[in-house]
Amino acid sequence: MRGCLQTVRWLTSAWQRPPSYPPLSRAAPCRFFNVSIPRNEQSRKPVSDLERRIAAIPIDRFRNFCIVAHVDHGKSTLSDRLLELTGTIQPGGNKQVLDKLDVERERGITVKAQTCTMLYNYRGEDYLLHLVDTPGHVDFRAEVSRSYASCGGALLLVDASQGVQAQTVANFYLAFAEGLKLVPVINKVDLPSADPVRALDQMANTFELDPKTAVLVSAKTGQNVEQLLPTVVEQIPAPVGVHTKPLRMLLVDSWYSTYKGVILLVRIFDGEVRAGDHVGSLATGLKYHVGEVGIMYPGQTAQSVLRAGQVGYIYFNPAMKRSQEAKVGDTYTKVGSEKLIEPLPGFEEPKSMVFVAAYPVDASDFPHLEDSINQLLLNDRSITLQKESSEALGAGFRLGFLGTLHCSVFEDRLRQEHGASIIITPPTVPFKVIWKDGKEEIITNPALFPEEDALRAKVVELQEPFVLATLTFPEEYLGRVIELCESNRGEQKSLEFFTATQVILKYELPLAQLVDDFFGKLKGSTKGYASLDYEESGWRRSSIAKLQLLVNKVPVDAVSRVVHSSQVQKLGRVWVSKFKEHVDRQMFEVVIQAAVGRNIVARETIKPFRKDVLQKLHAADVTRRRKLLEKQKEGRKKLKAVGNVVIEHKAFQAFLAK
């Protein structure tokens, strides 16, 4: 009993006694945590060998350059070889370090512009090289143009076996307009089909570049690639900037990190930026505290400072949470210096030109689809998003893209990275409606297209977008390509031979025809040897109409499209015959029609199930026979009048599949 009381007494006294920690001396440092980053004088000093080397390099030994080429001419592979030569990555293998997306590696294309910093010792002196790997496809031209603004020169890369292609020409003129110094490079000289002499002649005739300055390489094997770096140092000019001037920082790109918020890829034109600096946006007026600055080497490598002439990344603390605040082309400066600097020339906001509707296969997956789309939009602000609803397919989204490849890449990323099961409608383009009261309206959703009565009474004219397409292909396919363009309502603008066997053909085409698998048809007509590039050519007056699919005279809202009047009959017949294949028979007759307003352009009928009501009758009982048939007929009419056609969800999925 005494032992129990002693135990209780000890426990109660221990509960009242303060913990016996050793007392803190006055000299002991006390650590406090704070969300903001204090300005530390030690951060001004280089803390690593890499920073010491970079700090010792003056701006006249900086080189900012990119690689200009047609899609699939070897830009990313050449980037890997340059990173290996400078010791930025370990040699061996085709890593495609700058292609970070799964879809980029799978398709062999570059979608997002990436940058990497390299240190190169040339004749005993260190040089700081910033390489930007840009997309080659026309759909990602916004990525290309913003990359060029951060560079002083470019390697103009041409495949030795394919020669100059359409996007080589288009990207050359973009780089030329930015005033970049161009260095000709012939790639894939190791291929049996390589013809470097022909490629050099094409570059001389098309771009007026001196073939003697060209470097012949094989990015795959590394042959002759080591000659490129001295060429970059000698021919590409150093950036212009003064690190003692007020900060002028151009936003080139941005992406989203779960832990750091929006990360900005920036080019410093004047001044310098450090962790702890208070900076502001000239476009939005918002102000931020810099959390970290650094370079891509090849991953994010923190630095004490980014100086004039450098390309690097920054993020803020507290973080920038909304990617809409990061406006590409915006100028940032330190708070208090806004009136001391002029904003840098920005970029035009990209305009969506191809629209699709996306619906989940299972309606219960809508929240997951919405979350997946919003996550991808954090890294791609060129996509427009609007919620919409369909009676046939349920809740979904209308998405706007820069082009068909942009749309296809986004769809692949939804499926691969987020496991989304989705139904995508065929791509459509915007149309312009000019009303009699003078107002103009751009319509991106076929469901909002004016009805027939409104068209007659209130609309002055309808317009559709046109593009100027540049096609390059061998001369032997000229007849087929012209026939294809003419059948797609094209208007020829120019025809020239830039070599004895290669043709550059320019046509003005409706964008609606271009997104309707025009490139696939072009590849088929030229056995895969043609290339295509295009640019906007304005709006044209056009005879267009809204084609709808009706099931028992009820419009199917998920299947409607604005098309040219010349395509109405053909597309209507295709629709009704294809839809008939996927609709099950009912207890009553199902009529499938394609219509423009009240005008029916095509029709298919699905016969009902038929019960043999005459099975038990005697052959001679004509009156009873007629009576039963009439009763069955009346029953079908009544069922057709009040019954709803049951169309399975998978029928729409199969109908909308490519």
From Swiss-Prot:
Molecular-function annotations in GO? GTP binding; GTPase activity; mitochondrial ribosome binding
Taking the first listed entry, what is the main subcellular location of this protein, grouped into a coarse class? mitochondrion
Tell me where on the tree of life, at the top rank, the source sits. Answer: Eukaryota
Q: Name one GO biological process term.
A: positive regulation of translation
Its Enzyme Commission number(s) read: 3.6.5.-
Q: How does it sit in the membrane?
A: Peripheral membrane protein
Q: Which CDD domains match?
A: EF4_II, EF4_III, LepA, lepA_C
The record's subcellular locations are: Mitochondrion inner membrane
Q: Which stretches make up the tr-type G domain?
A: 60-240
**What reaction gets catalysed by this protein?**
GTP + H2O = GDP + phosphate + H(+)
Q: Which GO terms describe its cellular component?
A: mitochondrial inner membrane; mitochondrial matrix
Q: Which residues form a coiled coil?
A: none
Q: Where does GTP bind?
A: 69-76, 133-137, 187-190
User: Which Pfam families does the protein's record reference?
Assistant: EFG_C (PF00679), GTP_EFTU (PF00009), LepA_C (PF06421)
Q: Where is the transit peptide?
A: 1-40
What PROSITE patterns does the database record attribute to this sequence? G_TR_1, G_TR_2
Stated family? Belongs to the TRAFAC class translation factor GTPase superfamily. Classic translation factor GTPase family. LepA subfamily.
PANTHER family linked: TRANSLATION FACTOR GUF1, MITOCHONDRIAL, TRANSLATION FACTOR GUF1-RELATED
The protein's job, in short, is:
Promotes mitochondrial protein synthesis. May act as a fidelity factor of the translation reaction, by catalyzing a one-codon backward translocation of tRNAs on improperly translocated ribosomes. Binds to mitochondrial ribosomes in a GTP-dependent manner.
Which protein is depicted?
Translation factor GUF1, mitochondrial
Species of origin: Paracoccidioides brasiliensis (strain Pb18)
This protein's encoding gene: GUF1
